[in-house]
Amino acid sequence: MPAVRPVVAVAEPLIAFRDVSLSIGGHEILRNINMTIGKGEFVCVVGPSGCGKTTTLRLIAGLMKPSSGTVTYQGKPVGAPRQDIAIMFQDYGRALLPWRTVAGNVSLAMESLGTPKAERAGRIDELLAKVGLRGQNDRYPNQLSGGMQQRLQIARCLAQNPAVLLMDEPFGALDAMTRQALQDEVLAIVAATGATVFFVTHDLEEAVYLGDRVVGLLPHPGRVAKTVSVNLPRPRDQLTSRETPEFLRLRRELFDFIKEAEA
């Protein structure tokens, strides 16, 4: 069962979108996005295809810049990518370096931080144990299952000691049991580290299970249309939490939102 962590107030946002719009090649992608994310908060983003979920994540990461408005981190405009913001993608096949071992992929993040070589091995062992990959150091990504490759991505992200985890549908390609196991691992890691999470997903149940809040976007152009607070107690459980009346109510509310958006 995931560890307990405090409910977070959003009085002083760690990340803020202020009237953010984005157009590319004359095509309007986002319009007037206003959104805040508090330190230690777990925010999930849902919406139909084409609503800009991944684009908002890339703006936080500093991989894109808005056409107008501002995205701020710790009160300052986001510029280039930062070491304390880690990104985890769904396509683990492209995210991992196939010519590096499991340990080598985790080491990459430490190398970029300038961690002395003598200090890396112990930290790598610690991180691999934390994500359930103890003893897998010398294997290569193509020797791992999809779930194990995603665990490796998590370990590599944690090697950056990130304050923020940006997760772009990381479990969408996995089977149901593996997906739920990784959901619980992420919740446990977040509880232990206090990291802030911005999590993009198409899975409404996943959004309710993981999040403190769920933000719903509408498409063409992408814009914020709904924000739902998730007041389910933590730690959450894959069986009992999902069977509560509040979980079912929130899932239905989000389902109706998506259904109406796609009508």
Question: Where on the chain are the PLM-derived regions?
Answer:
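The feature captures the beta-strand-to-loop junction immediately N-terminal to the Walker
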Residues: 46-48
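A short, proline-enriched helix->beta-strand linker immediately N-terminal to the Walker B motif
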Residues: 159-163
